[in-house]
Each structure stands twice: as structure tokens, then as C-alpha cells.
A protein has these predicted regions:
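Domain-level signal for Mg2+-assisted phosphodiester chemistry and nucleotide/NA-binding surfaces
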Residues: 1-88
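Extended two-metal-dependent nuclease catalytic cores across DNA- and RNA-processing enzymes
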Residues: 10-12, 39-40, 67-254, 261-265, ...
């Protein structure tokens, strides 16, 4: 939701219009439900909880995002407040399973559910982290940004390369580099394509020294979704088993109260 919200804002705008963002998010849910409901079943809304467990393992995880926000003129308190309001509305009024667990990210929720189910699953996300879940043939992914299916011919190999290279957008350095190199803007040790092609077919113990092996395991725990802590896995399962709070019979009143007039005519698609 944050990504779609930012895309809807002009460069000079410091706040968001909650009515516009609400309409945009709900219309997207309607559209994807119409497109995929018949083959993949009902929507499940997976949201980030606060205080990701990954920061306990790696305190610099996503640290650069806060730095970027602090340097921005946008009113992040107002923006996140609007998003929290909309998330609360989705949980309270809509007939979909809504999962948000303290210390878990949406990635954890999606990873746990994808591993638990054998029926067809469609993940709606542009995040390539989910390619690793495609080791199961029932898991597919659609990118709202490219409007294309996201896939890879070898998800296991993709995951290992991801661990080797790290993920600069999340503040995770490659396995040859120190923890703080991204935050401190220190150039990472280069990794060539030729080296990666050699390493992905080996065990890390075969090509890493002690420090590199430590960094490899650092990245593996942050990136590989099978490392979601067991207590979080249990909480995700419990929330999934709960009956949704919202009912379709209450949607009309919600749409009228929020002046979602353009969506009322499509209410049956929710």
C-alpha cells in the first residue's frame, strides 16, 4: 500500500488525500478479486506488523528507508496515519481474512501461507523476494507494476544468488561486505557474474572464509523465508483460522458513509 500511495502523490505534495487513497486501494482489491477469484479463491490481506524481527537479527535492516523519510518534506505521520486507518477499515468491514502479526512482515505471512497450502495461490506483489516460493508449482505471482507474471526457471538458484548479492533496497549488503557498508555509503566489494555462477553450485563452506560465511548466514536468515521464527509462524496460523470480522451485507453502508459512490455500482465484485 505504501508503494501505491507514493506513486499517487506528486513530487510537491506533502500529504495524501485519504479519500483518494481509500478508493484506489479498494478498487485495486476489487479488480484483482475479479481477475483471480474464480481460479485462486478468496482474497487474503497480508500486512506488515510493527518492529520486524529482522531488526533484532540485523539492526541496520531497512535503516536507509528511515533516513530517506527523514530527509523528505512529506508528512509521514499523516501518510502512515491514513494507511493505518484504511487497514483498520479493511479488517473491520470487509469479508476477507486479514493478517497482521507484531514483528512479522507481509513477506513472512505470505511465505507461511504459501508453504502451508497445496491449492493454487496467486501472490499480488512486485517484490521478487517471492520467487523463492515458486519451488512449489501451485504458487504464482503477478506484478501490479509491470502487469506481468513474475517467475524464474530456477527459484532455488535465484534464492541462493539473492543471498550472495544481498538486497540494497532493504539495507542488506552482499556476503563479501560489512554490515554497515550501505548505511555508511561505503562501496561494497564487487561480485562478478562469473563468480556468482560458480558459487551458486557450491556449498558456502566451500568458498567462504570465516567472515564471509558469517555474512552469508546473515543474509540467508534475512532473505530466506523459511527462517521466519516459529512463534510468528504460529501466530500467523492462528490469525488465518479466525473468521473475518466484516460481512458483505455491511459493505453498502460502509461505501455510503465513506462516499465511495463510484464503487457502489460494483459492490457485487467485492
Amino acid at each position: 500500500m505504501v508503494a501505491s500511495t507514493m506513486m499517487s502523490m506528486g513530487k510537491d505534495r506533502t500529504e495524501v488525500d485519504i479519500s483518494m487513497i481509500r478508493h484506489m486501494i479498494l478498487n485495486s482489491l476489487r479488480m484483482y478479486r475479479q481477475k483471480y477469484h474464480e481460479e485462486y479463491g478468496e482474497l487474503v490481506l497480508c500486512c506488515d506488523g510493527r518492529n520486524s524481527w529482522r531488526r533484532e537479527h540485523f539492526p541496520l535492516y531497512k535503516a536507509g528507508r528511515k533516513t530517506t523519510r527523514d530527509a523528505s518534506s512529506k508528512d509521514w505521520t499523516q501518510i502512515f496515519g491514513c494507511l493505518d486507518t484504511i487497514k483498520s477499515e479493511l479488517k473491520e468491514y470487509f469479508p476477507y481474512k486479514y493478517i497482521e502479526v507484531e514483528a512479522a512482515e507481509a513477506d513472512d505471512v505470505i511465505g507461511v501461507l504459501a508453504k502451508s497450502w497445496n491449492e493454487p495461490i496467486m501472490i499480488i506483489s512486485s517484490d521478487k523476494d517471492f520467487i523463492q516460493l515458486q519451488v512449489k508449482e501451485n504458487v504464482k505471482q503477478y506484478s501490479p507494476i509491470t502487469k506481468k507474471i513474475v517467475n524464474d526457471t530456477n527459484p532455488e538458484r535465484y534464492l541462493k544468488e539473492h543471498i550472495l548479492r544481498g538486497d540494497s533496497s532493504d539495507g542488506i549488503p552482499n556476503f563479501l561486505s560489512a554490515d554497515d557498508c550501505i548505511v555508511e555509503k561505503i562501496r561494497q566489494a564487487p561480485i562478478t557474474k562469473k563468480k556468482v555462477e560458480l558459487w551458486v553450485d557450491q556449498e558456502p563452506e566451500d568458498f567462504c572464509n570465516e567472515e564471509q560465511l558469517r555474512n552469508y548466514h546473515r543474509n540467508m536468515k534475512l532473505i530466506d523465508l523459511q527462517y521466519t521464527p516459529s512463534n510468528i509462524v504460529d501466530q500467523i496460523g492462528k490469525q488465518y483460522d479466525e473468521i473475518p470480522k466484516g460481512k458483505r451485507s455491511g459493505l453498502l453502508n460502509f461505501f455510503i458513509e465513506r462516499k465511495l459512490n463510484n464503487l457502489i455500482e460494483s459492490i457485487g465484485e467485492f
